Amino acid sequence: MANRLKEKYTNEVIPALSEKFNYTTVMAVPKVEKIVLNMGVGDAVSNAKNLEKAAAELELISGQKPLITKAKKSIAGFRLREGVAIGAKVTLRGERMYEFLDKLVTVSLPRVRDFHGVPTKSFDGRGNYTLGVKEQLIFPEINFDDVDKVRGLDIVIVTTANTDEESRELLKGLGMPFAK
C-alpha cells in the first residue's frame, strides 16, 4: 500500500512544481530526501536514565531505534567530557519518512498550543527546513502519564531543492502549514 502523502506528491506536487519552476524532467523536481529527528538531553550527563527515557520516546515517535549521540569534545562549563552520551537521533527515509511527515502535518502540529503555522524563516539557504518542537507531548504515540519530563526535539527536513523558494513550495504542496 502506497503512502497517502507519497501519492499526493506524485499526482499533485510534481505537476504543480514542474509548471511553476519550468522543470524539463521529472527527476529535476525537488523531493524530500530524509527527515532527521534529534533530541539533545543535557541532563544525561548527571543521570543516564534520562537519556534512556528520551531514546525510548524518540523510538515511539519515529518507529525506529535511535542512535545515541556522544559529545565530540569536553566543555568544562557544561561539565561535559568527550565521548559521554548526550543525545539521540533518528534518520528517517522512504516509507517511514512519508508516514512521519504525514503524521507531523495532520496530527502533531495542530496539537501545538497557540499554533499559527510554522515559521518561514527556518530554511537554511540550501533548501533544507529545520523545525524545533518544544514538547514531545504533541505526538499521539506519547502517553501523557508516562512522561517524566517535557523534552523538545529538532526536526530537520532535508530536500533535494537547490533554493529555499523551491523547498517552501514543495513542503507547502505536501501540506506543511506555514505562518502567513
UniProtKB/Swiss-Prot annotation:
GO terms for biological process, alphabetical: translation
Cross-referenced InterPro entries: Ribosomal_uL5, Ribosomal_uL5_bac-type, Ribosomal_uL5_C, Ribosomal_uL5_CS, Ribosomal_uL5_dom_sf, Ribosomal_uL5_N
Coiled-coil annotated residue ranges, if any: none
GO cellular component assignments: ribonucleoprotein complex; ribosome
Sample GO molecular function, one term: tRNA binding
Recorded superkingdom: Bacteria
Keywords tagged on the record: Ribonucleoprotein, Ribosomal protein, RNA-binding, rRNA-binding, tRNA-binding
Cited Pfam families: Ribosomal_L5, Ribosomal_L5_C
Gene3D superfamilies reported in the protein's UniProt record: 3.30.1440.10
Subunit structure, interactors included: Part of the 50S ribosomal subunit; part of the 5S rRNA/L5/L18/L25 subcomplex. Contacts the 5S rRNA and the P site tRNA. Forms a bridge to the 30S subunit in the 70S ribosome.
Physiological role: This is one of the proteins that bind and probably mediate the attachment of the 5S RNA into the large ribosomal subunit, where it forms part of the central protuberance. In the 70S ribosome it contacts protein S13 of the 30S subunit (bridge B1b), connecting the 2 subunits; this bridge is implicated in subunit movement. Contacts the P site tRNA; the 5S rRNA and some of its associated proteins might help stabilize positioning of ribosome-bound tRNAs.
Database matches in HAMAP family: Ribosomal_uL5_B
PANTHER family referenced in this protein's UniProt entry, alphabetically: 60S RIBOSOMAL PROTEIN L11-RELATED
Family to which the UniProt record says this protein belongs: Belongs to the universal ribosomal protein uL5 family.
Family matches, as NCBIfam families: PRK00010.1
Name of this chain's protein: Large ribosomal subunit protein uL5
Organism: Streptococcus uberis (strain ATCC BAA-854 / 0140J)
Gene symbol of the encoding locus: rplE
